[in-house]
Amino acid sequence: MFPYKKAQVPAIMRLNRCVAMLLSMFSFWIPALNGAMDNNLYGYIIPEKTKAADGIVVEHVLLYPQESHDSLKRIARHGMLVRSDDAKATILVCHGFMCDKYDVGVLRRIFKTKQFNVMTFDFRAHGQDGEGQYCTFGRDEALDVTAAAQFLRNHPELCDKPLFAYGFSMGAVSAIEAQSQSSELFDAMILDCPFDSSERVIKMGLECLKCSMFGYEFDLPGRDLLQKYAFHPYIQALVKAVLKTVAQLDATGVSTNFCPIYPAESAKMITIPVFFIHCKNDQKVSVDQVRNVYEGAAGYKRLWLTNGRRHYDSFFYNPEKYIEQVRQFYNQVLNGELEGLPQEGIVEDDDEDEHLFGA
């Protein structure tokens, strides 16, 4: 009808690409706008899934964290918020590697329903709709934590309540990274078994790589090279296979991208109260790793070393004592009692500590 001149074609093609890009950006916001206009930009409540009974409301949430630190593109993650009108604060639970929001639902038992709202959510590449996403063991998961925390900060029923983080393993590291990047994200944190660097996690796993000959045990040749180049994309598949075999660290079930991350350094930016918990018998994260993270924290801090038998076992080894300690810390924060206490300290359970609390 109106034929283009040959010289105009490249410009028109560029214009078409720009329009397509803008449409893709706006398409991200369409679900949020259709779902709940009164919610915030970090996510929205799926109204048809909301349930309420006896003063308790359960909301299913769709979160929209950034895909990466250098991209404005968003991904979708799923969460579940259980809230009460009488709650004094909100807890954001950050799960560990190979878990999801339903696996950690049992942790809601730690927090009294009428006292705390609790939100669980799926980290990227975990749980619902994780296809095409990659786990980075805390680096990009910090963006998931930020989106979830900001959603709660802007929730109309929760925005005036303190927000606390509870994270274990990878979830604890992700919370550290998020808080170090945004100092007003949380009011306090409980961090169970965080590692001090991704390099140390890989190193501990590869230390199990040994061979035996004539009754003697030797380091398997090539172990140092695997450790040195563990973050290289061409080496990661081999590293994952080795870690699965020798260290029971199965990174093959979740799309994973090992990335350099240093929570012990990031912890130096944290000034809010932090309660660290760790098992003395943890074979994946050593006690000195957690001490390194603890020593870096700049605000009120406590470290409790338990007799748990393995990685993230403090809760399961002695649930009564664990629940008591966690509740006590959060109540001290809520009641403003920490200012009059020593600002740091390490408590270690006796080796002969009885299994049952109070025994």
Predicted regions and their residues:
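Alpha/beta-hydrolase active-site loop
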Residues: 135-156
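Hydrolase active-site cap/lid region
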Residues: 180-256
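The serine-hydrolase catalytic nucleophile loop
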Residues: 97-110
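An N-terminal hydrophobic leader/cap segment in hydrolases
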Residues: 1-69, 344, 353-356
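Catalytic histidine-centered segment of alpha/beta-hydrolase-like enzymes
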Residues: 309-323
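Conserved alpha/beta-hydrolase
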Residues: 108-130
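Short beta-strand/loop motif that positions the catalytic acidic residue
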Residues: 269-271, 276-278, 282
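Short alpha-helix in the alpha/beta-hydrolase fold that links the catalytic acid
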Residues: 272, 286-295
